[in-house]
Amino acid sequence: MDNDRQKALDTVIKNMEKSFGKGAVMKLGDNIGRRVSTTSTGSVTLDNALGVGGYPKGRIIEIYGPESSGKTTVALHAIAEVQSNGGVAAFIDAEHALDPEYAQALGVDIDNLYLSQPDHGEQGLEIAEAFVRSGAVDIVVVDSVAALTPKAEIEGEMGDTHVGLQARLMSQALRKLSGAISKSNTTAIFINQIREKVGVMFGNPETTPGGRALKFYSSVRLEVRRAEQLKQGQEIVGNRTKIKVVKNKVAPPFRVAEVDIMYGQGISKEGELIDLGVENDIVDKSGAWYSYNGERMGQGKENVKMYLKENPQIKEEIDRKLREKLGISDGDVEETEDAPKSLFDEE
């Protein structure tokens, strides 16, 4: 580029930075090699499936699936992980169904969890936006998109039709939220339900409420489904759950994480350490027996889970070795640069 054109471009960029702040315009190459900043999901299996070691910060995440599949459980584990690293969490309970005792059992510090139970959708999304724009909240969970009922629908009669109201509400909210979420480095998790399209003869009839906006704005979309029941004798104690990464803008998609969700306890950390340990040759399996470093831990997966609960040192050792082998950090992964750099900053 000749000098006159370069001077003209420099002047324009300086004016932009005066008007809109430092970092309003950057060269793409300045960001190459910059590691994605993440926060752990609370599950080493899901961290691995996401490809970057957890949920990317400053992005929108959608978790959807059938009823009682474990969507809220997955989100609560992320909140517990953020809080354990000194972060601040907020929960927008549009369904008015959060169980504080269950949240506490999953490791959530309920005394320091900011909770809102909004009267209507607009209020819930405005509260979420206020939390994000504050820059002081690390994770915001909205449970659920389907329960964000527009004010007009709540104030109307029971039989009134409100075509596309919720979709328009979500579209407008996400247009406002997406930029603020990126700047504040907040992880925003939207939990969603499943509906069926009427009259679909071919293909998948399932869809998610709230229009298409959330599908577009989400960097990660997770589909949560129960695979099978887990039994201890005749008693059903939990579910084997499949979490499929349907969309991923920060790593290759379509990877699947299989976890054990135990009733009243959440994701079994011991269960996933056993499964991943066997896959990665850290835990040895011979028939129904499991052993570590030549020492037998037990016969059958449930017995080995109990062994790991009773021996936290061995559990931590297996966890550390797994994270090292898979290249997953324990906790937050920070970016190399905290703030955007001006094109005119001196090296």
UniProtKB/Swiss-Prot annotation:
It comes from Staphylococcus aureus (strain JH9). GO terms for biological process: DNA recombination; DNA repair; SOS response. HAMAP family: RecA. GO terms for cellular component: cytosol. CDD domains: RecA (cd00983). The keyword Zinc-finger does not apply. One of its GO terms (molecular function) is ATP hydrolysis activity. It is found in: Cytoplasm. Disulfide bonds: none annotated. This is Protein RecA. Keywords: ATP-binding, Cytoplasm, DNA damage, DNA recombination, DNA repair, DNA-binding, Nucleotide-binding, SOS response. Its main location: cytoplasm. InterPro entries: AAA+_ATPase, DNA_recomb/repair_RecA, DNA_recomb/repair_RecA_CS, P-loop_NTPase, RecA-like_C, RecA-like_N, RecA_ATP-bd, RecA_C_sf.
